Amino acid sequence: HKPLQDESGALSLPGVPIVHPGIGGYPFDGICGAVVAWKLAWMCARLAAGDEHGRLPSHLRSLLADLTSLAAIGTIADVVPLEEENRMIAAWGLRHIAQCRIPGVEALLRVANLDNKRQLTAMEVGFRLGPRLNAVGRLGKADAAVELLCTSDRNRAESLAVALDEVNRERQELTKRMAQEAEAMALANGFDQDDRR
């Protein structure tokens, strides 16, 4: 969902094939990268199935249902507006996450203490799953989140989810310390006085 423009504002495309909702007349350009990837996977599955009516074999339907959970997590964690396609994908994905068979999603639900829920809310995804996935990226270790969501090894998924949980706790502590330091600096400089606010 990043604009493809140069410094002057003109459309600037790389010399490689791209899939981007902001070009080619797509009706809604507010989708996040996770939804772009999901839609690309859906189209590839339809082409691979070779059915002109878009019917998919059950194994591809099951896979795409699981991938919709990832698209929903990405939509909510990326904080794109929950309107139009985003709302539909988030709603469907939220209903499906608890049944998702992706080992990394199952492990992430366990470390977030959400594995016993029948249906998650956007708040739970946004404040309990998203931060665990995003924290590693903020601290320069995004590969761990990608591996978590891509691995088929349940033991590896579990250890990665635990590691992401630990990094998220570290990020929370760092944020808390920084807020305390900022508050102390503000107080030391008299910004608690009415005339300095």
Regions from the PLM with identified roles:
Residues 32-40, 69, 125:
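Catalytic-loop motifs flanking and including active-site residues across diverse enzymes
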Residues 2-36, 46-49, 56-66:
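Hydrophobic, small-residue-rich alpha-helical packing segments that form membrane-like cores
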